[in-house]
Amino acid sequence: MDEQEIQRLVEEVSLQYFGMPFLHKAMFNSRLRTTGGRYLLNTHNIELNYRYYEMYGKEELVGIVKHELCHYHLHITGRGYKHRDKDFRELLKAVDAPRFCKRMINEEKGKKVYMYECMECSLQYVRRRQINTKRYVCGKCKGKLILIKKTS
């Protein structure tokens, strides 16, 4: 899905569910990490997270678009557009938009694991942070530690 398709989708959803046109820009923002989308108050544009579309498909994206359009139309008409406002919550229910989007499954960020072993007593240590083996020693026998495995 490219920028023109997302613009067309937002305009269609706006007319279908809200009965009002969307007159500004809708675009994907690759810098969004934990949020499905955002409505920009200054420019009235809507930014969407492309990774939600890749992960959950068009249905979830339409839900995110409806949520952001609730912010948009309420702000344009001068009513309460914030999450805590009654107008916003009522409009969410009326158009069946989600209040929150699904959690992002973060598969690309694997946790690094470092495995150290004592050269004297062979005790193994598993750590998430790398340690300085010249400075730290085994807590059991004070032997020297060596890095045996690093997984990412």
UniProtKB/Swiss-Prot annotation:
Binds 1 zinc ion. The keyword Ligase does not apply. It is found in: Cytoplasm. Residues 7-148 form the SprT-like domain. The active site is at residue 68. GO terms for biological process: response to stress. Pfam families: SprT-like, Zn_ribbon_SprT. Its main location: cytoplasm. SMART domains: SprT. Its cofactor is Zn(2+). InterPro entries: SprT-like_domain, SprT_Zn_ribbon, Uncharacterised_SprT-like. The keyword Metal-binding applies. GO terms for molecular function: zinc ion binding. GO terms for cellular component: cytoplasm. It comes from the Bacteria. Keywords: Cytoplasm, Metal-binding, Zinc. Zn(2+) binds at residues 67, 71. Belongs to the SprT family. This is Protein SprT-like. It comes from Bacillus thuringiensis subsp. konkukian (strain 97-27).
